[in-house]
């Protein structure tokens, strides 16, 4: 007997509808059919994974050509422009100094549901985003989403990766993000905040007040998704953060990146019924401290409610640190 079957046998079940030994025998027969279906599903998923790997290799030259055109490394020929339904825009003027397609990926992201976590402070940095690539990691089903940036005033990274590591059964294991190497004074994902602490009076001593400066996370695309800099307070919260990250990565990988030009044009949609609202998953809680401390805001990612959404509060303004 397989380990999976042993686990299934240990699961509790409702026996109220099993009214006789004959019905029990029939239910066990259905469970046998279910075992076979599970085995076929597992086999199907493995074969689908192999097909995806095969076609990912075929897609790569197309993605590279797209990058060359977007970045301005090459100019498309007349033959390159023979699409099935070319678009026309009236009253455009020639600007020979224009290079590539400016802010292509910024416009792509702003036309997806990811826009809900893009703040004003993200926009200038995202203007330097020149490509998003899907990279298969070895022979495993692991893959990474690589964000490629041109030289910019914010950080020294040219590539920031989010690597998805999966178990053999395709279950999510972990997501590893590249740390961002911020340039001095350019980290807009944190802000300094003064906190006043008042001590309790003791015999012979009056209460004293001291001030200290703390670094607080500013919720935005870079701090909550690209390279999260929040420390989860529990294993449950860590799992929730990872799950939300995976939802965004999967949507970018499966829907947005393959259809990037249509998202750029605003004529594609990544919204699905009962979809997560990513902006609402990154919730800003406000709470009152006791008399020893002034009011302090804490940024957390909240667990979705039964409807698959957590209700947000307004995020604080983005400031550079």
Swiss-Prot record:
Q: Which InterPro entries match?
A: NAP-like_sf, NAP_family
Q: List the Gene3D superfamilies hit by this protein, alphabetically.
A: 1.20.5.1500, Nucleosome assembly protein
Chief subcellular location: nucleus
- Where is the protein found, in the record's own terms? Nucleus
User: Could you give one GO CC term from the UniProt record?
Assistant: chromatin
Q: SUPFAM superfamilies annotated for this entry?
A: NAP-like
Tell me, what is an example of a GO biological process annotation in this record? Answer: nucleosome assembly
Q: Where is the composition biased (Acidic residues)?
A: 272-298
Key word Aminoacyl-tRNA synthetase present? no
Metal-binding among keywords: no
Q: Which GO terms describe its molecular function?
A: chromatin binding; histone binding
- Provide the alphabetized UniProt keywords: Nucleus
UniProt region (Disordered), positions on chain: 272-321
Chain intervals with Low complexity compositional bias: 311-321
In the record's own words, the domains note is: The acidic domain may be involved in the interaction with histones.
UniProt function note: May modulate chromatin structure by regulation of histone octamer formation.
Say which family it is in.
Answer: Belongs to the nucleosome assembly protein (NAP) family.
- Per its record, how is this protein called by name? Probable nucleosome assembly protein
Q: Which organism is it from?
A: Dictyostelium discoideum (Social amoeba)
| Taxonomic lineage of the native organism | Eukaryota, Amoebozoa, Evosea, Eumycetozoa, Dictyostelia
UniProt lists the gene as nap1
